[in-house]
Amino acid sequence: MKNFSKILLAIGIVVGGTLIASTPARLDYVPLSNENPDLEILLSEPLEQLIPGTEKRLVWHDGEQRTQWAVVALHGFSASRQETAPLANLVATSLGANMFETRFAAHGLKNNGLVGVTAEEWLDDVANALTIGHLIGEKIVVVAVSNGAALALSMLDHETMQNVDSLILMSPNFAPADPKAMWITAPGGPLLLRMIAGDTQSWEPHNDLQGRYWTTSYPTKTLIEVIRVVDRANEKIESVKAPRVQVFYSPNDSVISTAALLLAYEKIQTPQKEINKIMKTGSPSAHILAGDIISPDNTLSMAEQIEDFILHQAL
């Protein structure tokens, strides 16, 4: 009996150690500040590896000169700048602003999309995007979707956020629709994820253009990086004051938890915030709220709402 107890103890130690060892690291990474930013270097990327139309894009409003406003667009997980286009461009035009649309690491690739990418790389991408925003405009408006919104909130206390006037958050991800997915970053989460979901995630695009500009098949373990970002975003909104915040969401969203979104919205510390419920979308998941590819009918009205929010600051 004593030997049996020892065996059970040994098994427990091994299993416990394995679970702890497989626990994803907390996302505490702080991107380094770029003291002497070079716009050309910040915009550089391996174009030959990218699907045309997914590359970073800088649009000058009136020649290569700084404008009062700068619009910085951050797309969602597995997507590209085409996700809600031309929403950011419409907002920039109405503000007389320069615009930068980023491409997150491992997105928009012709081959091996989302392979080996980390949340730390995405935070670097946000820091670089905001640095570009500072170079092209005095006050930055961030238009961010889903995981891009969570990444923006994850950077609230970073110095690159200092010139951000407004955060426009579309379907921000504070938790997946399936609450069980949050255990991905718990002890043993990655092991369970692989056992339950397999090595690869694949999904059917809504139309040909979504199939072209989104990554529709990727390693399941990449979802761990998404939840690491979500965990950090939830931490930051409770402890760090945000710029002005405007949120758009659909109560029928089947990708993110709207209950978690509404709870998080109440916690956001900001001098001005607004939340807008979008009832009709062209998205089967009700997650992509604007853009020519999925929800074209909402794009113009949403751009007008964003412009109105930006230009009419609370006293």
Q: Where does each model-flagged region fall?
A:
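N-terminal membrane-anchoring alpha-helices
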Residues: 1-40
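The alpha/beta-hydrolase serine catalytic core
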Residues: 28-56, 172-238, 278-300
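Short, surface-exposed "cap/lid" segments of acyl-processing enzymes
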Residues: 51-104
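Serine-hydrolase catalytic core
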Residues: 59-65, 213-283, 296-311
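Short beta-to-alpha linker loops that shape the active-site pocket of alpha/beta-hydrolase fold enzymes
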Residues: 103-108, 173
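Catalytic nucleophile-loop/oxyanion-hole region of alpha/beta-hydrolase
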Residues: 109-136
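Gly/Ala-rich beta-loop-alpha elbow adjacent to hydrolase catalytic centers
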Residues: 143-152
